[in-house]
Amino acid sequence: MEQSVNLSRRSLLRGRSPTTPPPIRPPGALAEPEFAGKCTTCDECVTTCPEGIIFRGSGGYPEVDFRQGECTFCMRCVDVCADGALSETKRPLWRLELRVLDRCLARRQVVCQTCADVCEAEAIRFVPQLGSVATPQIDDDTCTGCGACIAACPENALEAIAHG
């Protein structure tokens, strides 16, 4: 039986497999195909971001790196986007899924709650475990996707996955 793999030309040229999640774009980014069609890679959003979390990524398109800091939702990136690739009216501003990786200190039986301490939305809570260290749980409905927890984690044990 013959199997075929469906790779878009862009994904193939960028070395991404169909299972690789899309990069995290600045808040208010249109859906990926429309974003790529409108973004002129002018770098205005990169240079205007006061937190320094937007960088020139693959193909010159802007991406967000939460390891550099959190998004304060100041929307300056949207304000300077003349080509319409970022829109303040898009809701939600982005759809991110946060994952706690195995290298999390709490998962390795070391008491650490840094991520919860910096989460203004209180989307991270630590669930007590009988005879064990409390482990983090993320409430996706409460999480704003600001990335403060990612920047603060001493083990880089949180990752954000973009969805659409």
Regions found by a protein language model. Give the residues of each.
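Non-ligating segments of multi-cofactor redox enzymes
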Residues: 1-164
